[in-house]
Structures are given as structure tokens and as C-alpha cells.
Amino acid sequence: MGNKFLLSVLAGKIGARLQGPDDEVSGIAAVDAAGPGQVTFLSNPKYAPQARETKASAIIAKQPIPGAGCAFLLTPDPYLAFARAVGQFHPPVQLAAGVSAQASVHPTAALGKEVHVGPFAVVAEGAVVGDRVTLYPGAYVGKGAEVGEDTVLHPRVTLYEGVRVGKRVLLHAGCVIGSDGFGFAPTPEGYRKILQVGTVEIGDDVEIGANTTIDRAALGVTRVGPGTKLDNLIQVAHNVEIGRDTVIAAQVGIAGSARIGNRVMIGGQSGLAGHIEVGDGVMLGGKTGVTVSLSAKEDRAWSGIPAMPHRTWLKMVTLLPRLPELFRRVTRLEGGKSPEGGE
């Protein structure tokens, strides 16, 4: 049975003000799916028509919505209040402390208080696992690795030897931290592997999505700063440094020794060349190809391949469909003929 709240109580927990009847609610749902006894939210005005038709008991919103026949939980930031409300109705699962008989914990490993180690999880020689850490089945903490308190490793997360993970970190299924960087020296006989002898450091309050891979440094440290959030299926190469509170969407690839600043936003499927810098506060649109260093002082938003100011890119893509006609017009004006295959 889920949590139930009077709307007045829920309002206090999410930083909102109740306007309307103080009904009891027991869940949260999308604006077009919510029913009686549930809360929904409106942060994008384009969904106001659906909000007017909702069957929800209450809407989290900036201001009352004319025509909506329900209560309102009013707040300056509906999206943040929505995030808090979800946490009230669906609190994180707390697994019972203890070590499964099917787990493997090396005698020299150190486990903190109230740690959960699930079946087939492995804690290797000299590893340190902090208080209240959760290791789901199949998680692997390598030799000498460190895991900070209140961190969660979902199934099949792999921390290689010597990796350091901070506090309150959430690592989703299948992510790999500390595998070898892609380093090879060409020789006449082929490629000789360069041993990757550095490590990876993950700061506090980081979240890393499923099947994301972060390579250990060749020398030194590959670093992800505090509060940064990485989506699924991201590749972070050796010696990359990512600042704090940066967000990176799925399928991004970051080549070796790139430097990403604080509060950067990177859209999905973007690619960043090695040894470049992306400054604090820069925003990259989806599929952006970054081949040179970028700074918010030049322009905050960048898109395209190669990366260019977003407004320039918008003008360019607007012109692209017109290029065949423009080409024909220029050809006629010059009195020439279109090249073979032209129209």
C-alpha cells in the first residue's frame, strides 16, 4: 500500500501552497492519466488544455488554471515540486542490511555499518565500502576500490581496481567504472598496448546511467565532479575531467583528456574531440560535434557539426532545404548549366 497524504500535508512537504479542498491523495500521474485521489503537475503551458480536463484531485502549478475543477498546489517551480512529490509517494527501497551467503567478501575488505551485499556480489581484496551502501546482485567492487556512504550499485555494476566513488552516488545496472583507456602505440608490427595505470574518481551525489563506461586514466585521474548526472550509454575516455553539476544525455562520446566545465549541458549523441575544453555553463544541442574548445563567453548555446553558435546553426538548417532551388537560380543567372545530376 502506497503513502497517503492530505493535500495540506503534501503541500508542506513539497514547498507548495494549497488552494482548494484538502482531499486525501495516494499517488501521482501524468496530467492526461491522473484520476481522483491522484496529483498531477503542469510545468509547460502547452499542456494547459489537458490540465483543464484532468480528473486529478490536485495540480501542482505556478498559478491556478481557469476551468480546471480541482485543487491546486501552487509553487514557483512546479517541476521541482513534482520531483519532491514523486519521492513522497515512492520513497527509495531500503534493503535489509547483511551479506548474502552467495556473495564474496574478501577477508581484507572493510564493510561499513548497515551495508547490504546481495547474491553474487563481490567485494575484492582491500576494498572499502562505506556505511549504508547497497550492492545489488552481481555488483563488483575491485581490489582497493572505495565506495562512499549511502551509495547504491545496481546489478552488474563493475568498479575496477582502485576506483574511488563518493557519497550518495547512484550507479545504474551494467555501468563500468575504471576499465582500460583506449591507448595504443603504433609500431611496424602493429599496435602495442599502453598500460593504463591511473584511476577514476567519482564525486559525491553523482548519478551514472545504465551501461555507461568511464575509462581509467593512462596516468593520473579520470574525474567526474560532484552533482553531475550522466545518462545511459555514455563513453567517457581516459583522463577526461568533468566538472560539478553537469548533465550529459545518452550516447555521448567524450574523447581522451577533454575538459568539461561546471553546469554544462550536453545533448544526446554529441561527440567531443580529445584535448579540448568546454567552458562553464555551455549548452550543446543533440548531435553536436565539438572539435575545438568552446566558451560561454563566445556563445552559451552551440549546435551542429562542427559546433557553431546555435542561432547560426538554426539559420543554416533553415536554408538547407532551399539549396537545390538556390543552386538552379544561380546557375541560370550565370548562364551556365547545372552539373550532371543537377536539376
Predicted features and spans:
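Terminal amphipathic alpha-helical/low-complexity segments used for targeting or macromolecular assembly
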Residues: 1-102, 163, 168, 174-175, ...
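Structural signal for interior beta-strand "rungs" in well-ordered beta-sheet cores
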Residues: 41, 98-309
